[in-house]
């Protein structure tokens, strides 16, 4: 089916999904390669502490994927979850500057848990919610 053959409402939804996935993957690809560098150079974490942060992110991603999958299945229409993830993506930079970085410098475990929860929700559940 061609884009021009879609009903106006379907075209509108298609454009929203297209924009969501474009910005989601853009932010993900811009953040991920530089995240270990940011942890080491800006937050002065050791390689072991960086490993703890990455392990926490992976753990919470594994935990949240089925939870968001069930929520997505029960809601049927996934717009609410997409908007939630969109808001979390918009708050990405303020979270890193004002929450994640100070927590990592004060307590590596607390920072890893909070960062793992946030990043696990935003970057690991969005593809499943949107598909």
Swiss-Prot record:
Keywords: Cell inner membrane, Cell membrane, Membrane, Sugar transport, Symport, Transmembrane, Transmembrane helix, Transport. Residues 1-13, 72-80, 124-131 are cytoplasmic. GO terms for cellular component: plasma membrane. One of its GO terms (molecular function) is lactose binding. Its main location: membrane. It is found in: Cell inner membrane. The chain crosses the membrane at residues 14-34, 51-71, 81-101, 103-123. It catalyses: lactose(in) + H(+)(in) = lactose(out) + H(+)(out). InterPro entries: LacY/RafB_perm_fam, LacY/RafB_perm_fam_CS, MFS_dom, MFS_trans_sf. Residues 35-50, 102 are periplasmic. It is a multi-pass membrane protein. Gene3D superfamilies: MFS general substrate transporter like domains (1.20.1250.20). Belongs to the major facilitator superfamily. Oligosaccharide:H(+) symporter (OHS) (TC 2.A.1.5) family. Responsible for transport of beta-galactosides into the cell, with the concomitant import of a proton (symport system). This is Lactose permease. The lineage of its organism: Bacteria, Pseudomonadati, Pseudomonadota, Gammaproteobacteria, Enterobacterales. The gene is lacY.
């Amino acid at each position: 089916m061609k884009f021009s053959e879609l009903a106006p409402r379907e075209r509108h939804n298609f454009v929203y999904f297209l924009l969501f996935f474009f910005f989601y993957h853009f932010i993900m690809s811009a953040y991920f390669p530089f995240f270990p560098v940011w942890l080491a150079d800006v937050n002065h974490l050791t390689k072991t502490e960086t490993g703890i942060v990455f392990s926490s992110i992976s753990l919470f991603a594994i935990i949240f994927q089925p939870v968001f999958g069930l929520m997505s299945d029960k809601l049927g229409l996934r717009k609410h979850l997409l908007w939630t993830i969109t808001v979390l993506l918009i708050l990405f930079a303020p979270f890193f500057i004002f929450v994640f970085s100070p927590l990592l410098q004060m307590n590596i475990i607390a920072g890893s848990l909070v960062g793992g929860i946030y990043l696990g929700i935003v970057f690991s559940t969005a593809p499943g919610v949107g598909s």
